[in-house]
Amino acid sequence: MNYDYFQLSLHVFPVHFKEDINPDSNLVDILITSNKCGIEDGDVIVISQKIVSKQEGRAINLETIIPSELSIGIASAYNKNPKLVEAILSETKRIVRMEHGVIIVQTKHGFVCANAGIDESNVDGNYITLLPKDPDSSAKLIQNEIRTKTGKKVAVIISDTFGRPFRLGQTDNAIGIAGIESILSYEGKPDTFGKILRVTAIAVVDELCSAAELVMGKTNKSPIAIIKNFQFESKDDHISNLIRPEFDDLFK
């Protein structure tokens, strides 16, 4: 088989921000003026959750939070700030596990993660950032604004860093999507030996987030990456399709 290696390759470009993001910022305007590679039809724009949360006013001063008795009790038992625990519980659908100073919950979005996705990094002072209330809607709004201002049809993925239950280290995962399918299914297709694949489904949006994170990093003020040359069908999907149903959860 003759491969077209250009067609099989991805090109991932970081977008460096010179300014911090706040509710008065316009992410799309900054993206358009700051990127060095241009925006074209078929690009995948991966955006860090942190800047979306900041722009949507989801950065909260811990000092404004009044912890409940439950939060104070949990904080005492697990050596955490009771104000932070209160913020975690406010974003939580159910507590999955609390051990070794770690609180694993299912968020109201359905994500299972530490601290309900609440983060204290890359924000000033006593501030924390909560996840966007509706990351799919956030991604769709950004996608539409890019289309309006550039005329280009792109996919948008909002990413966040999650731990993994049976492996060390974190990876970036999609928490909101627009214009791209969340899963690429190979079910029913033959493998290289002609065997029919039955259960292979690739979480492509998560893999794209991990590729993007390699150039975005955590400390170089590049909260957006533009992925070029990824072949995909433009289609609206929902991040909920990546969440395993509870009846399929063997570990709950």
Describe each PLM feature range.
Residues M1-K252:
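N-terminal and secondary-structure boundary signal
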